[in-house]
Amino acid sequence: MRVTVDIDEYAEGAILLDGLEGAIVGIVEDFGSPGRKMLYSKQKILNILQKRDLMTYDEAEEFYDYNILGLYAGELNAVFLDLEIIPIKKEDGWEYQLKE
């Protein structure tokens, strides 16, 4: 059974990025924050920009860096998840590599 929530009530005051609703992957809570924040997938945002706005990957990444990641809209600003890092367990700890 699915439960539908009113995002404005569940994450009151969270910044929603217009036109990027399809890139939402969750909601983030942390101690000391005044409320919940929307969690977006960087890769999904880049895909939306490429398809919707007919950008190349490089153009989409530059637009993301300056106009989305660089946007500060207050304490409940959106946060972004980048799944391009792969954790690798080593004998003496962890190593992190970028996906190719």
Set out the residue ranges of the language-model regions.
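C-terminal alpha-helical interaction appendages
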Residues: 2-100
